[in-house]
Amino acid sequence: MKTSLLAEHIREVKDFPKEGISFKDITPILSNPELSNKVIDSFIEFLNDKDIDAIVGVESRGFLFGMLLANALKVPFIPIRKAGKLPADTIVEEYALEYGSAKVEIHTDAIQEGWNIVIHDDLLATGGTAVAASKLVQRLGGNIISFLFLVELSFLEGRTNLLDYSLSIKSLIKY
């Protein structure tokens, strides 16, 4: 798939969510079923030779393609949510933000020991959220076999923060 076609459908919103940020909005892709299917097809092609037990999606935009991908691969979808959002027993991981910190959580029974996990989120920036998700997966005994992102902000070098967890990292669009 030509990434330029996808990139044409990423809307840049200046000064959102705060001044100085150029937000990469994926909703134009979501409103185009043909493009959404091409995203899933591209991810499946990348994962073709991998043994996958589950897809982990990070709240909230990681749920969108994560669930579609899990269904296409016929494997479970596992949500990682902001702390306090899951109803059963959870484990929590805190991570740094440019303006403070945040916490994410996963159900303690979500991953079986030894499962091969793909972590998906819509955007890779500094890698903080993906690292926190990785730590949660590992604490439950899962193996991270790949990271998948729709968009990567390469200038922030977040990819380097993920290399301790998996060398298999795919971003469809890089800025």
Which ranges hold each PLM region?
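Active-site-facing substrate-recognition patch
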Residues: 1-52
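PRPP-dependent phosphoribosyltransferase catalytic core
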Residues: 6-8, 131-175
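Residue-level signature of catalytic and energy-coupling elements of molecular machines
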Residues: 20, 55, 77, 147
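Short glycine-rich phosphate-binding loop at a beta-alpha junction
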Residues: 52-59
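Short Gly/Thr/Asp-enriched flexible loops that form oxyanion-binding sites at enzyme active sites
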Residues: 64-73
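Short, glycine/charge-rich flexible loops or terminal/linker lids adjacent to PRPP-binding catalytic cores
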Residues: 75-118
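Conserved G/P- and acidic residue-centered "switch" motifs that form tight phosphate/ATP-binding loops
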Residues: 122, 127
